[in-house]
UniProtKB/Swiss-Prot annotation:
Catalytic activity: pseudouridine(1915) in 23S rRNA + S-adenosyl-L-methionine = N(3)-methylpseudouridine(1915) in 23S rRNA + S-adenosyl-L-homocysteine + H(+)
HAMAP family the record matches: 23SrRNA_methyltr_H
Gene3D superfamilies membership: 3.40.1280.10
Native organism: Thermoanaerobacter pseudethanolicus (strain ATCC 33223 / 39E)
Positions contributing to S-adenosyl-L-methionine binding: I55, G89, I101, S102, P103, M104, E105, M106
Record keyword rRNA processing present: yes
Subcellular location(s) per record: Cytoplasm
Protein name: Ribosomal RNA large subunit methyltransferase H 2
Family: Belongs to the RNA methyltransferase RlmH family.
First-tier enzyme category under EC: transferase
Length: 133
C-alpha cells in the first residue's frame, strides 16, 4: 500500500511531528507512507490527487474500531486500491469516503498523530503481531 497523508491547517508542533516521524519509521516495514502539512488547501497538488482513493478524516465521518480499520485496509488491498490519499482538515477535496478519529474537534497535530498510531496498530493486527490493547 502507498499512502500520502495531507494535513491542511496550522503548522504542527514539533512534538507531534516527532511522533509522526516515529510512526512513519515503524510503518515502513508494512507500507509506503508520506506526510505533508499544507498551510492552506490551495497548496494541495490537485493534479496528482485524481489517481488516489481519497479518505477524509472528519469529526462527522464513520467511526471505526482498530479492528475495523485493519479490515478496511485489507478490503482496499483486495480491491486493488493501493494508492491512498488521506486528507486531514480539509473538506474541499471530493472524497471517496470519510472516517472519524473522534466526534470531537482536535488540533491538526494530534489528529495526525492519532491517525499514524491507528494505521500502525491496524498493520500490527493484520500481521497477527502483538500490540497493546
Amino acid at each position: 500500500m502507498n499512502y500520502k497523508v495531507y494535513a491542511t491547517g496550522n503548522k504542527i508542533e514539533k512534538f507531534y511531528s516527532d511522533a509522526i516521524k516515529e510512526y512513519q519509521k515503524r510503518l515502513n516495514r508494512f507500507c509506503n507512507i508520506s506526510f505533508t502539512n499544507y498551510k492552506n488547501p490551495q497548496q494541495l497538488p490537485k493534479q496528482q490527487i485524481d489517481k488516489y482513493y481519497k479518505i477524509g478524516i472528519l469529526p462527522s465521518g464513520k467511526s471505526l474500531s482498530s479492528e475495523e480499520l485493519a479490515e478496511k485496509i485489507k478490503e482496499l488491498e483486495l480491491s486493488a486500491k493501493t494508492d491512498i490519499l488521506i486528507v486531514i482538515g480539509n473538506e474541499e477535496i471530493p472524497l471517496n469516503e470519510s472516517i472519524s478519529i473522534s466526534p470531537m474537534e482536535m488540533s491538526l497535530g494530534l489528529a495526525s498523530t492519532i491517525l499514524f498510531e491507528q494505521l500502525y496498530r491496524a498493520y500490527k493486527i493484520l500481521n497477527n503481531e502483538p500490540y497493546h490493547k
